[in-house]
Amino acid sequence: MPSPPGDPQKESPDSMAVEIGAQGIEALPRRVDRYGKAKIGALEVAQYMAGLPDLQRTAQRVNGCGDYLVFRHYFTVDQVKLHGARLCMKHLLCPLCAIRRGAKALRAYLERWECITAEKPLLRPFLVTLTVKDGPDLAERFNHLHKAQRELWKRRQRARGSPLDGVAGAVWSYEVKRGSGSGQWHPHLHMIALAEHQPDQVELAAEWHNITGDSFVVDVRPIDQADTAAGFMEVFKYAVKFSDQPPADTVHAFLTLGGKRLLASSGCFRGVVVPESLLDDPDGLDDLPYVTLFYRFLEGKYALKGGAHA
């Protein structure tokens, strides 16, 4: 059965934040539990798709995702890496792949941010949110948002005076969900904008309304540089939020937006490469001794089925 709102079986988008740091053996049970909850969500989506004739092969892929997980514990430095797994790579459908994909992107852009701030210490990160009016047609609303965002960015490039003139680089993602009041599709955009001074929210709202014709709700706030990951995560949890919906909405969003570019960047954030593999990077640990831990998903949770030294 689908998990009701607030059910702890649903994986929180915040869970991907812990994916980017070094994790020791004591954290492994919690990590495996997170993946188990995400696997349950994937099974719900797969079950829904199994009843749709054109999606049965995709349903099988998602259903089998995360059937097993292989970890390596490098015990001399107490680090645990996800070394192997059966993954469907459908991160807009599968909560497990969404967590891994989001964490990979978060780590890649945080590493670029560290390089940027070392070269340009006056730049500060700001979280910018842009919304458009809710509507019943997801494709139409998404295209409206996408077109408006492109026009906003073009106005900055034309150097004719824009609230984003001081932005040296940005990375943004598109997120969709049902509006809490309307029940209609509510696409919106989260952006990390790098600038020396905070973009003016009032001016941005006026320009956004001029572009969209129906929307003026924007938000601009500084990101706490003592916890940059928390602010950046708002952008990179977009895939997790896709799967944090009823399966019917998740699948509809996937079919509607599956071919769209939902993560983009510009300026000094351009060119960041997010690894395709959803497994952990070895990070130079390959030559160290390790213990292999093999987990299988059985009866609604992961169970340790064996281990071996190497």
Annotate each language-model stretch with its function.
Residues 1-185, 195-310:
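Right-hand nucleic-acid polymerase module
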Residues 191:
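Cys/His-coordinated zinc-finger cores
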